[in-house]
């Protein structure tokens, strides 16, 4: 019973850390990376379709993304979708290849992005703490129903606290790496 609670808490904490990594990969740094456009959808046969399903996105160099559209008809729609996104990018079309130059980030924009990234990290820390609280309340329920002893409860709570500390440390490491990446000029 205690092992199930610990395992569930561990899985949920790992998912929180992965979700943070995924969210932070979409935050624009000075470098071109295909995941930057992963949140963009294109109207294709009347349905919004993720960009990576209608085109191939690669980093041409450190400051340019190259998008090869599979269907020539979609080139303008892809360009429009990129312009309409809130990424502040200006695509240039050359046949079926669309090049997206990334403008250098200003110091002010970098600081804004760091604030956003810190907010995301704090949200993940809160999620991890909520998972800890849920696991501890499950343990209290077992203790109340006399399915575990007080010693087992205390030991299990210590184990959950260790899991929480590890998850928060991972979040802090991800945050520090992203902040460093953002502040590089």
Curated annotation (Swiss-Prot):
Annotated localization: Cytoplasm
Xref: InterPro entries: Ribosome_recyc_fac, Ribosome_recyc_fac_dom, RRF_sf
Cellular-component GO terms for this entry: cytosol
Top-level taxon of the source organism: Bacteria
MF-aspect GO terms: ribosomal large subunit binding
Keywords, ordered alphabetically: Cytoplasm, Protein biosynthesis
GO terms, biological process: cytoplasmic translational termination
PANTHER family given in the database record: MITOCHONDRIAL RIBOSOME RECYCLING FACTOR PSEUDO 1, RIBOSOME RECYCLING FACTOR
HAMAP family: RRF
Record family assignment: Belongs to the RRF family.
Function noted in UniProt: Responsible for the release of ribosomes from messenger RNA at the termination of protein biosynthesis. May increase the efficiency of translation by recycling ribosomes from one round of translation to another.
Name of protein: Ribosome-recycling factor
Species whose genome carries this gene: Vibrio campbellii (strain ATCC BAA-1116)
Chain's gene name: frr
